[in-house]
């Protein structure tokens, strides 16, 4: 029977057994290499509360930075599809690997894929 994906939906190569993690959404036990992992960083308080805290802070505002919450989320495949963290892709598109964020030091012409065009002729994003 033909394989649906090159990696069979897992990141495990020649390891034998992979550890398990719990899905953040439903609690299902899923292998660590198969789980869809996302790293989330957010402010501890919302924007309006943050503004109030900074205005009423006793010390210099330049010395104070609000702490952030850093959470590593891991989802099972069904929850990741349901929450639209990953989407169902066609057979050709499954072969393409991509990252969710572009790096900051990439030039604008490289982001659009028109590296041969000069910067002035590029469409405005």
UniProtKB/Swiss-Prot annotation:
Keywords: Ribonucleoprotein, Ribosomal protein. The keyword Ribosomal protein applies. The keyword Iron does not apply. This is Small ribosomal subunit protein eS26. The lineage of its organism: Eukaryota, Sar, Alveolata, Ciliophora, Intramacronucleata. One of its GO terms (cellular component) is cytosolic small ribosomal subunit. Belongs to the eukaryotic ribosomal protein eS26 family. Pfam families: Ribosomal_S26e. InterPro entries: Ribosomal_eS26 (IPR000892), Ribosomal_eS26_CS (IPR047864), Ribosomal_eS26_sf (IPR038551). GO terms for molecular function: mRNA binding; structural constituent of ribosome. GO terms for biological process: translation.
